[in-house]
Amino acid sequence: MSKLVVIDADVLGRHRTGDETYVENLLRRLPVLAGDEFRFAAVTRRPDLVPDGVEAVEVQARFQELRMLLGVPRALRRLRPALAHFQHSLTPRWRGPMVVTVHDLSFERTATAMGRRDRAIFKVVVPWSVGRARRVIAVSERTKRDAVELYGLDPAKVTVTPHGVDPAFARGDAGTHSYVLFVGAVQARKDPLAALAAAQENGLPLVVVGPEKEPALAAELRRRGADVRGWVEQDELAELYRGAAALVLPSRHEGFGIPVIEAMASGTPVVLSDDPALREVAGEAASYSNGSDYGRALRAALADRERLSAAGLERAGRFTWDETARRTVDVYRSVLA
């Protein structure tokens, strides 16, 4: 009889960028790749977004804390899964086997990652959650190193499972390459103002795509001339990648960097901060800045567009959601062996 795995899918429909992309793609691919060995249920506020092949279990609550303290444990008791898989923040009180994915630990490394209250909460609940998990999934070697160093985890307990890239992001009609693109949450940690300065230094406008986590920063970007779009549908995002002169991501801390592989898969050069996770993802297929010269790094990328585009396409081909799902199934097997 197949074993039931319950996946917390609270992020569905919340425009949470990388976290939501990860959960969406796991839910699509796990049922196909796991065969008859496992079956899956998603605990979520948005059952309408759960793909075919996964049981949708609706759990509503006004606050995330109440959802995890009351709603999710109640669902787990009813479903009686062999294993539960959660994101790295708050996890419920549950005695069964648990896997936790850590996307990044930026709140531990930089004060600009989130507000003071949320940062204080995360500093308590994240180590508690990963400490209770049977296995921890890290999305990059950098995130694994952070988790081991900060929380004293046994390295053997942490499995690196990189993200993938959706086939929707592919090279197509090149467009005009008349703008620079920034994709990510609008927050100080991502430093979109540096992307704007680099674009303007090179005589190009900046298009900003992503949830406006810090409204004052989004307003400042608009005041300085950026085209701030907010969250957009995947089809529109794919077109924006293909039409961009370059993606500029000056982030001060990343756990992985899904926009990097999406841009590379689209044939678009990438300009990145010299961040360990971004180096891990892009390798030599990017132009890097040390934090003070994004204008120069962008000029270099524009001048070397053909080589960076080809190198990026090759690099992005190494990252697939099927491989992410396969490695995740291997983690489930190891926990239940």
Question: What residue ranges belong to the model's regions?
Answer:
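Carbohydrate transferase catalytic cores enriched for Leloir-type hexosyltransferases
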Residues: 1-337
